[in-house]
């Protein structure tokens, strides 16, 4: 019997990771599970249910010209109201890059600024709206499974409390009221349903899962920051962690030493950029080879390509690659940097820039950015150490310009979230 890409990724990575569900979609799916679960946030029991919302009226209002006028007038008074709401909804759209064609309403998702903007995938089948998986393929189900199965009860409760603060039940803002009204005009499950994919997730009980839980706990602890910063980081951290995890577990499956990811933060050294390009190619190749070994000749190249594509697409979406196509290499985008800082630090704490680069980026995430990490990764045999010193300096400048790094009079460099408040 042939193996599909979901069969392969469940065995290799623990859950369903597909190129069509890559990027920000795992984070969105995670939030759907968190907010739509009838048994509360991150239930310990397996027999939980979900009430899923399609938000089809608002999504069709934004992208579907065939939405009947009489349906629109049941909610919106006139054309002026319709135009105003459509412009607002456009501002709430999740930005999805690398789409050549114009997005249909089925591929249009809202960024979850408030709990009533959360919605599942849906499509128009005949004259009926059908709620189903299209882009929320299972990456978020794996993340949800890892979080709710945490055996550290203190950390689990902190994460639960963090989600409660992020999306309060009693929120009463104009945006929440509007989103709730529009969502109420769309389809939802008539009765709570059980998810089929989440229970099939496999735990490895390793340090990678601990890394994801710790990072999520830290992100949610930053109650001093605007909620949108935390929500964005929850989504980004889920994607970043999936990249870290796929890179590590592919090497493990092949019986090879885990690969360090080389980041070009300076953009001025051709040798470093080429090394980062080779590093990316090697990582993608290992994902493909590991998937091929798992399939053992029982899968098509198309299915194996979906596994490989999920890795690169997620890395590009969360800001870890310089571009979606062409000559690609690892970089640290601004959103990725902010997310990495929030995931590293708990609450209003701080850490030295040197320890952030070595203890967090390198030892925890396997990201090589500076001289010390390059030396530990045995890269200085082939590189002049000044290249990584300049790379580290440029990373520090980038973080300083965004307010994530403060340089004191004694030249001490400290990482914190102070400027984001």
Can you name each region flagged by the protein language model?
Residues 5-14, 27-32, 54, 58, ...:
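Intrinsically disordered, low-complexity regions
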Residues 12-13, 24, 31-33, 48, ...:
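Phenylalanine-focused residue identity feature
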Residues 36-37, 91, 265, 279, ...:
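Generic recognition of cysteine residues
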């Amino acid at each position: 019997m042939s193996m599909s890409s979901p069969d392969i990724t469940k065995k290799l990575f623990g859950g369903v990771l597909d190129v069509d569900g890559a990027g920000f979609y795992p984070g969105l799916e995670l939030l759907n599970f968190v907010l739509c679960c009838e048994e509360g946030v991150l239930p310990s029991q397996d027999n939980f249910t979900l009430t899923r919302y399609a938000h089809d009226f608002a999504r069709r209002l934004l992208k579907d010209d065939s939405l009947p006028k009489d349906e629109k007038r049941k909610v919106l008074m006139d054309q002026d109201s319709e135009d105003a709401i459509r412009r607002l909804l456009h501002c709430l759209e999740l930005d999805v890059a690398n789409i050549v064609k114009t997005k249909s309403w089925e591929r249009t998702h809202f960024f979850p600024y408030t709990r009533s903007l959360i919605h599942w995938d849906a499509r128009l089948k005949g004259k009926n709206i059908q709620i189903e998986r299209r882009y929320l393929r299972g990456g978020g189900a794996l993340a949800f499974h890892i979080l709710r199965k945490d055996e550290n009860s203190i950390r689990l409760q902190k994460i639960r409390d963090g989600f409660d603060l992020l999306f309060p039940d009693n929120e009463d803002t104009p945006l929440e009221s509007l989103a709730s009204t529009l969502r109420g005009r769309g389809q939802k499950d008539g009765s709570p349903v059980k998810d089929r994919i989440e229970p099939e997730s496999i735990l490895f009980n390793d340090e990678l899962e601990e890394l994801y839980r710790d990072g999520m706990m830290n992100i949610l602890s930053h109650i001093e920051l605007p909620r949108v910063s935390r929500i964005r980081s929850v989504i980004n951290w889920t994607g970043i962690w999936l990249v870290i995890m796929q890179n590590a577990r592919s090497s493990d499956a092949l019986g090879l030493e885990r690969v360090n990811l080389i980041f070009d933060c300076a953009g001025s050294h051709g040798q470093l950029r080429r090394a980062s390009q080779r590093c990316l190619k090697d990582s993608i190749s290992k994902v493909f080879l590991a998937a091929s070994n798992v399939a053992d000749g029982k899968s098509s190249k198309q299915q194996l390509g979906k596994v490989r594509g999920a890795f690169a697409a997620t890395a590009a979406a969360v800001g870890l690659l310089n571009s979606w196509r062409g000559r690609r290499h690892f970089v640290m985008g601004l959103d990725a940097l902010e997310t990495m800082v929030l995931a590293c630090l708990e609450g209003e704490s701080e850490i030295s820039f040197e320890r952030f680069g070595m203890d967090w980026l390198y030892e925890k995430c396997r990201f090589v950015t500076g001289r010390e990490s390059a030396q530990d990764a045995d890269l200085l045999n082939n590189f002049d150490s000044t290249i990584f010193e300049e790379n580290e300096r440029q990373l520090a400048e980038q973080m300083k310009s965004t307010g994530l790094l403060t340089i004191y009079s004694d030249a001490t460099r400290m990482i914190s979230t102070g400027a984001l408040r």
